[in-house]
């Protein structure tokens, strides 16, 4: 006899709320319905094992089918089924009261839901205008019933014609969700959400190419692997098994470097396999490759908050029933089990890396370039991981040799300790662009390491804090004598006028570029040293590099690159430039320089007159005289600078020296490089 009733919820109509609330994630309805079918099947297996069901279990599988014409998706199982009383209890009361409770709890925190795991049967209404449940219990003498609801609080319950035990969920898809009537869409969702469920999931037949088109075969199309690699014992798996499982997860990826098999049952349940991929030099492209499962049911691939941030660079699967899924991320991060799981995974990762380093260092070194970004990220973001990684982190020198922290310190401290007792680690970030600086350091007996990774600027700053009496200096940040200061700087023997003259001469020929700023500096580097070279101050350059990954440091990222054009005042060519200016320009500057001297003497007298007086007490005549003096000085200095600039523009030696320095630092390109080549040919 047909029966009508009202669902026991307080909302007038909960279904529009369900649709609206979870609209962006409505595709998970299929996972929920199929998972329920798997649960029903597993319950039958359990009842059979304890003797409560003595009948033939037969072929235990879940079947999914799509009828595009009838606009239905049907999920069928041969599990425990339900009696009429159970339908009343579990669908009309428990399921929908749970729905209402769930929606009320998270109405203000919608974005915080991680997997929407456990939404259950009512998720079918996210895509359906009507849902039919046709079910028959495994119990003897049970009769089949059909429950129907069109999205209003009313339902009908009536006898049904169903010979076998189990349940059919028939979803009549509404117009807004017609996309789910495409077989390709459903197969894709099953492949994502149901790939490793514990009961075979069948979706149609396998196909083959025949007679010019794809045609069904007689073989069932089983979507899932019911016994994936992570559920097996490590002793039962070979390397090829792990690699094959990786290929099933990431078909287009390169082969992993190695892996960790997780298998914990106390004090929490955790299984899984984590793979170390070949990480490219870009953090952002690597994330969200770990898949989280709960008893082999896919939950999410967004595992931030469940594992430490740096571990999101790994690939693989984590399966745990002890991770709370329908909670906010802030709750996740404070959950005791999650903290324990997170710490355990970090420890296992560090254990695995240290094990390979100790037992097979050649292999570890061979794979270091692909591991380095991951290890650095972990060291920067997780203190406990840093403590472990300090044992196997490797520096790489310019010849490709690799050293641990202790090994490298032993190598360099004899010759690379400065006058203050600091061990100076020299490094380059561009093997070719900084070659000349690296060569100067090597010729002096220094070792230079290569730090050209995305996170290296941050690692350098971290290691300066962690390693005792250690300072990192890029090879192009100063002259070779000053990179590792063994003694005080040699005195530069130039007068103030000579300094000012050289500054003006070389500034006149420096490139004009808003993104680059050059400062002329002087060093006494000996007659055998280079005449001119370009350095880049360590602090500002490092801040700019770090700003690329830290939004809060954007101020540094917006500043122009700052370089020092260092003139070796002991070199004959610098002396030649200065001597040439004295012969060619200074005679015409004698009167102007004398005038400047007179103006400065007059300025000093005017300043003396102002001493001890308030601004209002200074005579107007004195103020006017001071202003006129400043104008005249600027005018006279301008005349001097104009003549020096003209001389510099016509002087090929100055241009050649600057371009040689730019070329040595990789800064001479385009038209300037072409002009340098033409000038070099003229000079030859």
Swiss-Prot record:
Main location as per UniProt: cytoplasm
A: annotated segments: 1-329
Protein's UniProt keywords contain Lyase: no
InterPro entries according to UniProt: HATPase_C_sf, Hsp90_fam, Hsp90_N, Ribosomal_Su5_D2-typ_SF
The keyword Nucleotide-binding is annotated on this UniProt entry: yes
Region annotation B: where it falls in the sequence: 330-548
Annotated region described as C, given as residue ranges: 549-684
Disulphide bridges: none
Pfam families: HATPase_c_3, HSP90
The protein's name in its UniProt record: Chaperone protein HtpG
Organism: Porphyromonas gingivalis (strain ATCC 33277 / DSM 20709 / CIP 103683 / JCM 12257 / NCTC 11834 / 2561)
Gene name for this UniProt entry: htpG
